[in-house]
Amino acid sequence: GATNEGKRQDPAMQKFRDNRLGAFIHWGLYAIPGGEWNGKMYGGAAEWLKSWAKVPADEWLKLMDQWNPTKFDAKKWARMAKEMGAKYVKITTKHHEGFCLWPSKYTQYTVANTPYKKDLLGEMVKAYNDEGIDVHFYFSVMDWSHPDYRYSIKSEEDSIAFSRFLEFTDNQLKELATRYPTVKDFWFD
């Protein structure tokens, strides 16, 4: 568990300690509205806006039509990280809203179905690898966009639905590990 992390002496943990400085890229559809929805500011983290503002799923999905980061430059980001001394980067593959920065074949809620269309995650993995920076993935085990996700299991129907969600999650994780084999680890939230 987390209480034993400080005692680990294995090579992977030692490398993580030796890396010392890293970057964390927290990016998703929530970056478009930031912390504001319908003229109201919500304090705290923008990635929770959909939940805090109780935004209906169909309304949130409309943000995909605006997702077009044409000025995004993965190589520039990776160069800046290297210049600041980062030895690793943690990239959000998807946050709780379920929007995938890679073209997942298991959901339509993905960058492939936006005006940008490109595999942002793939661009970042390549750019950071090219700079000699280890890439780690953040992956939300919550997914507000998936119909079978459950906060709690209250019935047999919930249990069956959540089993389908677990299969979906397993498929996405296998997909990420296969598409991006140089990734060093996953951080589950």
Spans of features found by a protein language model:
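Mature catalytic domains of secreted/periplasmic carbohydrate-active enzymes
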Residues: G1-D189
